[in-house]
Amino acid sequence: MSSAGLLSGVEVGSTTVTATKDGITSNTVNVTVCSSLAGTCIDIFDAGGGKLFTSSPSVAYLDRIGGSATSGTITENGDYGPAGDFYIFDWNNANALCTTYNTLSLGGRTNWRLAERDELKMELYDVYLNMFTARGWPTDDYYWSATPVGSFYYYVVLRNGYVNSYTPSDTVYASCVSNP
């Protein structure tokens, strides 16, 4: 642990952490260190100002936390995301995923929602470029947005910034966002 109180993982595995300072003891928290996001972890990324984005969940992660409605799986081969299996979602199930995160108070927050097109494109891709390179996210498939266009919804490709739209029944990745 750093002098600023930052904990850094040095080995893959799980543990619990409790901190004490000036006679005050914190709550105990569970900490899991993963070798990649294909494991039982998810990336909760602060893109600035406390605004958090999640990577799309792996099968291992979502199953570990109790699951949510999904629409299938995709296997990343390591070219555009960490090698492993990830869930994909139709638009309704993508929204349900964010509701699941609220129920679980993911990252201590209960205001998770599906990211808007401009949040994915302008706040993630335009700033950090390829999210697999930047953060280890799966990017072989598109990411749903909450932004409608007629009876469709926009998606953003987080490996190249491409934006287009799909019908709500199509199945792709999902990133949930939480404002501070």
Language-model-detected regions and their locations in the chain:
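Short, isolated positions in well-ordered beta-strands
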Residues: 26, 52-54, 163-164
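Generic recognition of long tandem-repeat/solenoid scaffolds
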Residues: 5-9, 52-55, 156-157
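Extracytoplasmic soluble-region selector
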Residues: 1-37
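Acidic surface patches and DE-rich sequence motifs
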Residues: 2, 46-47, 158
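Surface-exposed flexible segments
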Residues: 15-23, 63-70, 124-136
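Extracellular adhesion/carbohydrate-recognition regions
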Residues: 34-112, 154
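Beta-strand-connecting loop/turn residues
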Residues: 4-5, 23, 50, 151-152, ...
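An exposed tryptophan-centered "aromatic clamp" motif
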Residues: 95-113, 117-170, 175-179
